[in-house]
Amino acid sequence: MLILVTNDDGVHAPGIAALADSLHGLGQVVVVAPDRDRSAIGHALTLHAPLRADELRPGVFAVDGTPTDCVNLGIHGLLSSVPDLVVAGINRGANLGDDITYSGTVCAAMEATLMGVPALAVSLEGDTFASSEYRQAADAALFLAQKVSEEGLPSDTFLNVNVPAGRIRGIRLTRQGRRRYGDMVVEKMDPRGRKYYWLGAGECDFDYVDGTDCHAMHEGFISVTPLHLDLTNFRSFECLSRWSMTYSMD
């Protein structure tokens, strides 16, 4: 079994090392990851500049691009064949609710799914961790990767996995919740009197509704959320079909 591992925290992050080490128990692992932290870069793809990949050691490549670039380059350029599985992570910090639209880790799994390769994204709650917590998350990733390998996934579906720090009570199948951010823009003044801004500094407001990824994590459970490539809101069809859609160029 050939497994491609990537992330958005960068090739030197402790999370990807723990993940790759754990997945060696399932098959051959090749790491293709950004050469630096590319967190919150979403599904960005480099189209107007060349990419370079340096092999740091056998089976570990550092790419001067995004996580989505890494998946493309790994599948179409660096690996000897199409991988059987793509695993992204272990992300430093949970990717819950609205986070999935920003996360390079989640979007790496999405990119693999677009290419027809089964995939999962794995994130660990918090910001600083003991090595034992990374190992715990890596063990969970191995368990779920094996399940995906054995059982497969529905068409156009990938898994967003979030692991709580500390004691784990079990695993729950969840739906995407909401993780709303407060005032994300902080305005400052530099010594020359010019304004500058920091993004993403607001407090988070979690949706702890039962059945959501946020609630499962809050209760100490690993959250496994199946995500689909088709973002169509089918429930809105009835409402929108009542709109008058007659349109003329005259």
Curated annotation (Swiss-Prot):
Stored Gene3D superfamilies: Survival protein SurE-like phosphatase/nucleotidase (3.40.1210.10)
Cofactor note text: Binds 1 divalent metal cation per subunit.
Cofactor: a divalent metal cation
Alphabetic keyword roster: Cytoplasm, Hydrolase, Metal-binding, Nucleotide-binding
Catalytic activity: a ribonucleoside 5'-phosphate + H2O = a ribonucleoside + phosphate
EC number(s) recorded for this UniProt protein: 3.1.3.5
Cleaved signal peptide residues: none
NCBIfam families hit by this protein: PRK00346.1-4, surE
Function: Nucleotidase that shows phosphatase activity on nucleoside 5'-monophosphates.
UniProt similarity note: Belongs to the SurE nucleotidase family.
Name of the molecule in the record: 5'-nucleotidase SurE
Species of origin: Syntrophotalea carbinolica (strain DSM 2380 / NBRC 103641 / GraBd1) (Pelobacter carbinolicus)
